Amino acid sequence: MSQHVHHAIDVHSHYFPQSFLDLIEKHGPGHGFEYKIVEGKGPQFKHGHLVTGPVGPKFVDLDARIQVMDEQGVEAHALSLSQPMVYWAPGNLAQRLSETYNDALARAHERHPRRLIGLATLPIHEPALALKEVERAAKLPGVRGFYVATQVLGKDLSDAAFLPVFERIEASGLPLFLHPVEVIGHQRLTAYYLTNLLGNPFESGIAAAHLIFGGVLDRLPKLVVCLPHSGGAFPWLVGRLNRGWEKRADLKHIKQAPVEYLRRFYYDTVGYSDHVLQYLDEVIGADRVLMGSDDCFPIAYEKPVEIVTAHPRLNAEQKRKIVDENARRLLRL
């Protein structure tokens, strides 16, 4: 184990354990998966229009990951799954995939207790199974939160079927991290990498709006929700949500104006702009911002710590909060 001492926590970092990949390779082809090994690069898989990989060593090999973390000056990664999650699988297989992934998170933490923690995945498309996995995973070593897509098989997070799961997560005291998988209008976003560049941030905004207008945040006042990609479109378009609330009677059912929900969320730094990070600080506050990288995808920050520490408009206290203190408090480190 590396003995380097850093004070930076990356909350947006993806991980594919070999045990999880083995299950996809074995069972995926029977459920619409195309799975292949790209020579010299690792496995690549496709489900519908979602293509993932090649999944290189940094996604799988914990020692390779720790080496990168040391090079970046990062103390800890909060490990999470990426597309296509487990929602493609029927109940029993989805449960097995989730348990396999979350058990791998626990083993990673036990191997590197100061460096690696986990955000547990859930078979939330099967809410009864998800409820059981919330209970089980919350007790695993190193699990510090839960990870859910911004929509699940076409259902938005305001769907009543998901409410019991969110209630159980709230009761656990652990935060809920969101991440896009399917994106709105993907047929128009296939060119120019727009599925990621535009589709993902708009998905985050739509998910936030559903949690607000769907009453989820009102019903669950202690639920902590973390948005990726600096909140996507949500913090930038909250004025439009506010205007709709002011002018439309059918939006008056929520307890307060949409802008008042900005601080119900946390936001990572994966916005790729000094201006975005400054906006989050000015409008929401540095105490709600968490450092992220999007490792180990090619779009990830090479120097996620420096993005914050070199920011010209943030003071030393704000930088400490974003790089380390907020995540340490939220994830109980």
Model-derived segments and spans:
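Helix-coil boundary/capping segments in enzymes
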Residues: 1-333
